[in-house]
Amino acid sequence: MLFLRLFIFTPFLILANCQARRTIKVGLLFVQNVSSLQVGIGYRTSAAAVLVTKNKIREDHVLDGFDFEFLWDFDECNEILGAGKTVDLLEVKKVDVIFGPTCSRPALISSALATYYNIPIFEWGLTSTRQLTDVKRFPTTLPFSVNSYSLAMAILGTLKQFQWTEFVFLYCNDGDDEKCESLKDDVQTVASAHEELSLAYTFRIQSKKLEDMRAAIVEIKKRGRIIVACVASGNGSKRTLMQAVALENANNSEYVYIMAETNSRGFVVEEVGGKWHYLWEGKFDDSDTFSTEDSRTSMANLLFLVDNMGMNNVVTPQYLNFSKNVIEMMKDEPFNCVEDCVGEEYSSVAKYAGQLADAFYAYAVAVNRLLTANPQAEIRNGTMILRNIGMTFEGVGGGDLTVDPDSARTSEIIMIGLNSSRLPETYGKLIINNQSVHFEQLYSDEVMDVWNGRQRPKAKPTCGFTGTQCPPDFVRDYLVIVIIIVMFLIFAVSAAVGAVFYAIRQKRKEIERQDELWHVEASHLKPISKKSKSEASQRSFASGPSTSTKLTVESRTETTRFIFYIYQVRNNEVVAANKHDFRPQLTDVERSELRQMRSLDHDNLNKFIGLCLNSQQLLSIWRYCSRGSLADVISRSSMQMDSFFMLSLIRDIANGLGFIHTSMLHFHGYLSSRSCLIDDRWQVKISDFGLNEVRGMDKLSTENMLWWAPEVLRGLEQRSKEADIYSFGIICSEVITRSSAFDLENRKEKPEEIIYQLKKGGFNAIRPSLLTDEALEINPALVHLIRDCWTEKPSERPPIDQVRSLLRGMNDGKKGNLMDHVFNMLETYASTLEEEVNERTKELVEEQKKSDVLLYRMLPKTVAEKLKAGISIEPETFELVTIFFSDVVQFTTLASKCTPLQVVQLLNDLYTIFDSIIEQNDVYKVETIGDGYLCVSGLPHRNGHDHIKHIARMSLAFLSSLAEFRVAHMPSERINLRIGINCGSVVAGVVGLTMPRYCLFGDAVNTASRMESNGKPGRIHVSSEANHLLTHVVGGFRTEERGEVIIKGKGVMNTYWLLGENDSVPVKSNMRKRENTPSMARSITPEI
């Protein structure tokens, strides 16, 4: 180790002696006034760790040519404070590196800011989010803390070590809504990535109350024996959970409970001032009736997976010395914490101070490496520093610490359990490096050490979780009775035994037969074949447009939730398969529910066909309804619905929901307009009912939650009949307004914002709008009913029987069914179709005229007519035409003061004036490129020598129009032009197939461009050829010789200024008028 240090640091020592000492500014973010965090990351017991490490850096001769200046502040684990304090460190104090924040949410914001400034930032403490290890997102961030993904990998390693292939996850967010949610997501991610591992069930405990935890244990016992649990730290939550385990008799040798945490020492609970007690000692409140020994016994099957800052659960002499120095050096410069750091609560070092020390030392070594390789390197370059961070060194705890720039610190998780003496003992160490985990076994005999003489628990008991999967042992249960009966009536006993066995067998056969009815084989599902494109196109041209809302089977495509098949067992019936994300192990209760669902039959209930268990993913099979869902019909808006139509749909939904509420299902749970299907007879059929255990594990989008009742969104209550009534009200609002739930297409809020407001509730809680089309006659009682259905309090919502009764009273005396009503609507539509066709024909003619006008604006009329007739346009030579070029003076300067939208508006206003002037002359506008304007006269319509006259008048009119032109958003600014004119021969023709343009080619075009670029603001620069036509051929115009000018690509040319037309106001007078206007115009239009 000494040789390695000399090898690394000797070159830099030589360099340091030759240069002046430099100072590295170190920024620190701490928690100061949050009492619950003092033990782990408190400022008064952790800040001096950098001073201890600074001494070690000096001893190892790292960065000998540098001094350190420590600048600190307090973010208090608040993301808003964290953002502000980080900006202050970066912008005001100009730090070279940041250590902190120590909590996940502010750490994400600070890391993003550090990435922007390319400043290295080292996270430590309670930063457990996995997002900080994303190198692409945070290339300058290196977390030294253990994140929830590492804990999930540790759980994976433990399960593999003991060959457990199936487990359940139990968690409670009460007291900490971030910790367990993060762990749950990462456990699901790890489980999904390993096929040999099955996360059978995930259950959230409603609160940390004992009764809620007992209810959770009752549910979990039906699902698994290996339970990974997560509850909030402190407040006695772990003790309460294990009490619930004992009360529900779930603490025998069949069960194992695993708790994975970072801010923990397992069974040891730390207190302020270095004190501690065991987890089973002490009571949190008066409701805790368990004795210390009972609580200790309840934890016999509990395993902890915890990070102990590299100390392997043993406090080493090195760490004791480090702890002592941190507390003592808080009184030294620069912290000078004398009076504020006195007290028993500040006598013991913070648990995570070692991470801060290790991170500071790793940073110093990385900078030393960077400067050794390149003495001129920038020490603020976070990306380059982290590229040099890969290393292994001795941490403050005495063990080796490995740092990987791609995956931060290599995590070491220890597994702690209770030995035969009911005292904590370390049974293993798990080394987590990115995607790999290694279990280092620290026990010699698994049975005796880990399980205290018992066999290792199985992931699934032999007789199943409910004990019902083992056949009854008739001999064992009835042996005495059999012997007695055999002694007296051997024949009767034989007959009785035979009858019992026969009855059991027949019952099982009946259950198996009924199970076969709902079990759908994947081989019996045939994908629906698609028609060829040519066939579909021929059908489309043959049939023309249609207003039908009925969807053909071929038009149905696979979605994220549904796929459509032909079920060959039921006469090739078309079915819809609902895809589910998880494949749980079905219990006997769930199988019984499936058998009953298979037998449900109602006019307004979609038929449940069964489950497909042997496909790639779990599928629930339902009867196909040709018109799709109610949401589809509303979104297509192709069928006009009157009030009778709407009321019929609503009544169908109410009837179907009433049947569900009185059936064995009791409630739907996920009712929405997407689960209300419509068949070809326009009858609503409710689908997607039942299977609540399966649906509860599906990943649903935020939009799917818009129909959920507020109490369900908040997690305060389970799904219920009252929640169905709320969903029914949302669906009714969609029907009468003919829009989606909450009219998302026309709202500024996103679904996430609406869900947040629904959870928030309040007196004026957010609900969909009930504004309907004025042409519809909606019964006011229906609107009142909808409002009653979605009221905030579940107890105030009307039951479904009352809803159905009210709907029957809204029929307004109308009789007949919905199909008759639809046929009457279609008959009325057919009678008006001919009139509508004639009206559409007139509209087509008008649109054709508009298209012609648009075409004539893009191309000359003669050219456009030829193209419409299919005649190719050959290039044509024009012997003499006049070309006009102009651009806006200092347009770049003006555009820099405007937004892009304002620049477009400015040019649009200016060119609108110019286009109106062009229409008064025989001039063709070729194109505009930015502020450049190109026009020509004399083509495609030849006009003799009048082309020079038209261009000259247009140019004078352009300059005259600028006197009154104002920039809309900058009224004080003035616009000026530079204009060039030339006469000569050109070739014109249509170029290109995509967006064809009528373009000009020839040297005369280039000369006109040179006249414009070599002109002056507010002047019309003309060539000698154009001047000759103006003064000697056409006449009537006044020009002034400019003299010889060097023209790029042309050499020396004699050019002229066009002053004006005889008997008209000269151009110079307009210039003087503009120059005398007070404004910033002079900055845009320089004086001539």
UniProtKB/Swiss-Prot annotation:
Membrane topology, record value: Single-pass type I membrane protein
Glycosylation positions in this chain: 33, 235, 251, 321, 381, 419, 434
Any single GO BP term: cGMP biosynthetic process
Region (Disordered): 529-552, 1069-1088
Tissue specificity annotation: Expressed in PHA sensory neurons.
Transmembrane feature ranges: 481-501
MF term (GO), any: guanylate cyclase activity
One of the record's GO cellular component terms: plasma membrane
Name of the molecule in the record: Receptor-type guanylate cyclase gcy-17
Organism: Caenorhabditis elegans
Gene that encodes it: gcy-17
